[in-house]
Amino acid sequence: MRVLLLIVFAVSSMAAQANPQPLEYFLKDSDYLDVALSPSGERIAARAQFDGKVVLIVMDRETKKIIGGIQPESDDAISSFNWVNEDRLVFTYAQQFFGSDQRSSMGELYAVNFDGSDPDMLAGFRASNERAGSRLGGTRKGDRAAVSMIDILEDDEDHILIIKFPFSQQGFGYSFDGKKPPIVSKLNVNSGKQKTVERLKFRSARPLTDKNGEIRFVSYQTEDGLTKSAYRPNKKADWQLLSDAFELDDDLSVVGLNDAGNAVFLYGPHGEEGFRTVFRFDFEENIYEPLFTDLDADI
């Protein structure tokens, strides 16, 4: 089913509240949902939930004092974050829309410095920095696509790797178009500028990169709605189904690569009962084994 995405003419979630609570307000009695150290280990970033709000807090690791962060408008929430370098973080919002009981993402990426300065919407439908009524074009346009990050690119302090799932216009709105190839781009986390890396030929592709930021595996959906996975040893090589490359089941989903880059974790059915579990496949030694065995259920 194609989900219609109406154009949202609303104030961005980056806007400040009229009377925002200080970030220290969320430090006491909060539930910490995610915690991550900065690359140097000197700072701690965390999503904190208190009284229905989810904010991003940055603390000094030694003193535990709040030194920065950001909080969205009252009904929105910080849904994920990642350190890009020692000073800047990339994050996503989950927004509360009228008539909905649940927050949902608009497929947009944001960035902010650890101290809360220089917040910006980097990529997504509303990421244009063009100004209404101006004769001068902006330096970037909004993406007619849903955007998500696929690699932090640890050796590059200024860029991350993203994937864009294009929309098509339907009347006054836009909807996801599964016929258009997903676009992989390198995104500058300071300027928002993008450079296309490649276009994947797979529908609803979920790519997986190695430690060098190269896409090696991809899981995708066929026109029949089936999940398949493919592999390539490098960018110049052709994609191969898992059955052709390693004699594995094609309906396994790719979960992640190990740090060494010589083994992949896969998710799929196991045993006569068909309980789904995680497998580890060493594609250099050709060893394939489940991580969890003796699976059972009493439902």
Feature map (PLM): residue ranges:
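Sec-dependent signal peptide recognition
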Residues: 1-7
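Hydrophobic h-region of N-terminal signal peptides that target proteins for export
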Residues: 9-17
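Beta-propeller folds
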Residues: 18-299
